[in-house]
């Protein structure tokens, strides 16, 4: 299982979101970059996903019963997004916009930075199934951008969903960059 941190820039409205989040978290210099930095010491992630791998032993908890990559090389990921529809197989809010969802993603591109997750994979997969369709926390996003808007405890944004799935206390305090830094710190402490 890995943490995938998105460092690319989407086109259209999602790209504007990537840039605004990067402006808030990484500063003006990173705001204007459209290509990922080769220097991974610069944290500039604007989105977080948890990636399930074939060796994780949670095939039975995946939407199609396998952690094997599909024909496009995409692996099952879990996160919360504001601008994607919840898949039809979700137990909660299928077809609705925004929230916790499973999605197959090719994370083996330079748009993603991957870090090992030293956490209980089964607990994360169970959390993912139990929370599919949970609403996206737009208020927390506004709070990151303006510093004054509180989060809604029943809703989660991407890094908050990932941190909560991992069992990290105060998950609402994590943004994509601080979650990536926390995971890298855990990995460094283990080595």
Give each language-model segment a name:
Residues 139-191:
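Activation targets extended, charge/polar-rich intrinsically disordered C-terminal tails
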Residues 2-112, 141-150:
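Glycine-rich catalytic cores of cysteine/serine-nucleophile enzymes that process amide/ester linkages
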């Amino acid at each position: 299982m890995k943490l995938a941190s998105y460092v690319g820039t989407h086109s259209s409205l999602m790209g504007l979101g990537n840039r605004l989040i990067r402006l808030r978290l990484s500063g003006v210099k990173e705001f204007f970059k459209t290509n990922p930095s080769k220097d991974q010491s610069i944290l500039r992630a604007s989105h977080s996903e948890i990636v399930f791998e074939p060796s994780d032993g949670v095939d039975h908890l995946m939407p199609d019963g396998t952690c094997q990559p599909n024909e496009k090389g995409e692996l099952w990921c879990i996160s919360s997004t504001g601008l994607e529809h919840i898949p039809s197989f979700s137990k909660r809010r299928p077809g609705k916009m925004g929230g916790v969802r499973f999605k197959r993603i090719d994370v083996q591109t330079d748009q993603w930075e991957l870090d090992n997750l030293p956490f209980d994979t089964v607990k994360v997969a169970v959390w993912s199934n139990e929370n599919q369709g949970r609403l996206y926390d737009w208020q927390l996003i506004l709070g990151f951008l303006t510093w004054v808007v509180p989060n809604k405890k029943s809703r989660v944004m991407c890094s908050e969903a990932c941190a909560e799935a991992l069992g990290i206390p105060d998950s609402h305090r994590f943004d994509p960059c601080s979650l990536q830094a926390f995971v890298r710190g855990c990995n460094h402490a283990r080595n």
